[in-house]
Amino acid sequence: MSASYWDSSQRNKWQYSRESLARTRQKLWMLECQLYPQGTNILMEGGGKDAQPVTKNIPITHRDLHYDRDYNLRIYCYFLIMKLGRRLNVRQYALATAHVYLARFCLKASIREVNLYLLVTTCIYLACKVEECPQHIRTLVNEARSLWPEFVPPDPTKVTEFEFYLIEELQSYMIVHYPYRAMEQIAAALRRPPYNLVLSPDDLQNSWSLINDSYITDVHLLYPPHVIAMACLFITVCLRSAAGARDLQETFNRFMADSQVDLHEVMDTIQDFITLYDHWDKYNEPWIKFLLHNLYLRPHAGGTTVSGAAAGSAGPAGSVLTPNGTITGSTS
């Protein structure tokens, strides 16, 4: 355990360069191609009024259901953690830790070989223990089942079993450092001379929201927390500057130059935000939910298969995607 990011396992064990992160994901990509060469078969409703459902194959080389390439999946995972966290009134720090656990886990394991909903539940359970705001496991499982009854098993021991698997994949490095505290420290430094720049509560709230969104991206696997905080504050100040506060932008730019923060890393982080919001405009939740229903609940012929235990379901249930984007034959 380390109180300093610079001596922490996050920096020494779980911080990647762009190149090393790409190599790590390429290994998982190759493994998925070997394990699931036939891809995933899905059942889609035919175009005509009386048309029969049609089976469609999604090749394994498609981006769908690959965490590193499928922003639909990333955004959906983010919403799953936030939804369950809010039901349990979990602190944001613990949810941030859960997001990092999930991102690290998805470097080592495919979504096709685990139950995503059980993974989300376990990440929150473990994060709450690490952040010293533990949740009773039965309460956690009951709330998770109220959201995703088909996917989360009623037996709490399934979560504890998955917890050991999660800890093993994380190599027992549990401590996570956040940009939230760095953002507060930067805001305090800006208030002091010679900058005398006071950010409004709305500015700080916008920056906080940007940090929340950053957990969908790779920046927490790439850069120190203070770089992410600086990028979020820079975006907030730019938005204020566009509204007419030019002096604010000039003062903040001077502060960034004086701070000696790596501006290339800050700009890379901002670019990740731009990429994220571009994909967010195209976010299609019914599609990713449908794919996960097919992956975990529907019996497959010649495609990806997931056992009932791994899916955490009471049994198979057929689901069909209709032309208007709704899912039939399911309750989630």
Swiss-Prot record:
Protein family per UniProt: Belongs to the cyclin family. Cyclin C subfamily.
Molecular function via GO: cyclin-dependent protein serine/threonine kinase regulator activity
Ranges for domain Cyclin N-terminal come to 74-175
Q: What subunit structure does UniProt give? A: Component of the SRB8-11 complex, a regulatory module of the Mediator complex.
UniProt GO cellular component terms:
mediator complex; nucleus
Instruction: Give the GO biological process terms.
Output: positive regulation of transcription by RNA polymerase II
Kindly list the places in or outside the cell where this protein is found, as annotated in its UniProt entry: Nucleus
Xref: SUPFAM superfamilies: Cyclin-like
Q: Is this entry keyworded Membrane?
A: no
Q: Matching Pfam families, A to Z?
A: Cyclin_C_2 (PF16899), Cyclin_N (PF00134)
The residues forming a coiled coil are none
- Could you tell me which InterPro entries the record lists for this protein? Cyclin-like_dom, Cyclin-like_sf, Cyclin/Ssn8, Cyclin_C_2, Cyclin_N
The yes or no answer to whether the keyword Nucleus is present is yes
Q: What is this protein called?
A: RNA polymerase II holoenzyme cyclin-like subunit
Domain of life the protein comes from: Eukaryota
Q: CDD domains recorded for this chain?
A: CYCLIN_CCNC_rpt1, CYCLIN_SpCG1C_ScCTK2-like_rpt2
UniProt keywords, alphabetically? Activator, Cyclin, Nucleus, Repressor, Transcription, Transcription regulation
In UniProt terms, what function does this protein have? Component of the SRB8-11 complex. The SRB8-11 complex is a regulatory module of the Mediator complex which is itself involved in regulation of basal and activated RNA polymerase II-dependent transcription. The SRB8-11 complex may be involved in the transcriptional repression of a subset of genes regulated by Mediator. It may inhibit the association of the Mediator complex with RNA polymerase II to form the holoenzyme complex. The SRB8-11 complex phosphorylates the C-terminal domain (CTD) of the largest subunit of RNA polymerase II.
Q: Which gene encodes it?
A: SSN8
